[in-house]
């Protein structure tokens, strides 16, 4: 089927660099091939620089941003866990939907779409639900373009609650200090 060229300017998918497209013409490497493992190690090291973390478990997920968020939630949440989720756009709302599908009890911290969520509201919610498994928020909400402040949420790291941040839109464009902000 002949396809016409497209210029993709949305948050994803996007047009790859010609070098990336050319790489598709090369023979595949198996996932246990020493060259593949070296490439994966290099990729993880570069990701650690972008995420500003020293965590050796920094790794890419082969899928959409929503697939990454879902992978995170299904590995962290069990039925009857509490998830506190900041919602000020489509992707905060999607977090709620995925958490509910995991069987979690969702505590929504809603803000008008297009306005940032006051981080103190999330901190106060965690204090009200001290056994919450996660506090989750989108760093830069794709649907509205609003940036939510994450640094104050580092206080959550002093509890047993995990801090989950969706940085699909912001990573690489806005500094994200995973270690400094104590993001799990």
Regions inferred by a protein language model and the residue ranges of each:
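N-terminal "arm"/small-domain region of PLP-dependent enzymes with the aminotransferase-like
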Residues: 1-33
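Conserved N-terminal alpha-helix of the aminotransferase class I/II PLP-enzyme fold
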Residues: 24-71, 97-100
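Conserved PLP-enzyme active-site core in the AAT-like
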Residues: 3, 10, 42-43, 55, ...
């Amino acid at each position: 089927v002949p396809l016409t060229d497209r210029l993709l300017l949305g948050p994803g998918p996007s047009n790859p660099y010609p070098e990336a497209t050319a790489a598709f013409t090369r023979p595949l490497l198996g996932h246990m091939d020493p060259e593949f493992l070296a490439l994966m190690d290099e990729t993880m090291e570069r990701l650690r620089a972008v995420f500003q973390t020293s965590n050796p478990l920094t790794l890419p997920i082969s899928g959409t941003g929503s697939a990454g968020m879902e992978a995170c939630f299904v590995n962290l949440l069990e039925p009857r866990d509490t998830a506190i989720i900041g919602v000020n756009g489509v992707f905060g709302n999607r977090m709620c939907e995925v958490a509910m599908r995991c069987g979690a009890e969702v505590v929504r911290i809603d803000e008008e779409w297009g306005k940032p969520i006051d981080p103190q509201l999330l901190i106060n919610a965690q204090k009200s639900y001290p056994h919450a498994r996660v506090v989750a928020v989108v760093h830069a909400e794709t649907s509205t373009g609003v940036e939510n402040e994450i640094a104050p949420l580092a206080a959550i790291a002093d509890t047993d609650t995990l801090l989950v941040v969706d940085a699909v839109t912001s990573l690489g464009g806005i500094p994200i200090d995973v270690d400094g902000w104590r993001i799990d």
